[in-house]
Amino acid sequence: MLSVEKFRVGERVVWIGVIFSGRVQGIAFAFDRGTLMKRIHDLAEHLGKRGVSISLDVQPSDYPEKVFKVLIGELDNASFLRELSFEGVTPFEKKVYEWLTKNVKRGSVITYGDLAKALNTSPRAVGGAMKRNPYPIVVPCHRVVAHDGIGYYSSGIEEKKFLLEIEGVKEWTS
């Protein structure tokens, strides 16, 4: 199922779409509905390739509102972990997502290298897991930055800056 809602954060419109079947299978967000729908279809395709059965039939749910509450800081990221299905996610990716969500709190960042050290792996492996994160905002991949700048973000650098600024992050270099 798919549930989509539009929210406002200050002057910015934010669209949030959640794919679910019992639990959350994937999350997408964008600043306009057209981009959101493209991201939802890309996410559904990615999950489908990983063996996840997806339905994009529209059905209202409270999931977009909950993701929005995480976005604006009214709901802690880690408290939302139990809502995620982790279908189509490798054991390594799940480990990375859970560690990041539980340990890198709102308003802070961690470098790819430091996250890799914490998990005894390589920065490249961490970067790959971040790129494939099906739960943006909730699993805060936007909080993972390069040692010399903001780094990459699948949804776009403008979106990453927006998320960090909402959380009060002023600088993202070490």
From Swiss-Prot:
TM region(s), chain numbering:
none
Q: Specify the enzyme's EC class, one word.
A: transferase
Q: Which CDD domains match?
A: ATase (cd06445)
> Thermal dependence of activity in this record?
Activity is stable at 90 degrees Celsius for at least 30 minutes.
Instruction: Report the coiled-coil segments.
Output: none
Q: Which domain of life is it from?
A: Archaea
Q: Name one GO molecular function term.
A: methylated-DNA-[protein]-cysteine S-methyltransferase activity
EC number in record:
2.1.1.63
Q: Name one Pfam family in it.
A: MGMT_N
> What does the sequence similarity comment in the record state about its family?
Belongs to the MGMT family.
| Alphabetical list of NCBIfam families matching this protein | DNA_protcyst_Mta_Thcoc, ogt, PRK03887.1
Q: Spell out the protein name for this chain.
A: Methylated-DNA--protein-cysteine methyltransferase
What organism is the protein native to? Thermococcus kodakarensis (strain ATCC BAA-918 / JCM 12380 / KOD1) (Pyrococcus kodakaraensis (strain KOD1))
Q: What is the lineage of its organism?
A: Archaea, Methanobacteriati, Methanobacteriota, Thermococci, Thermococcales
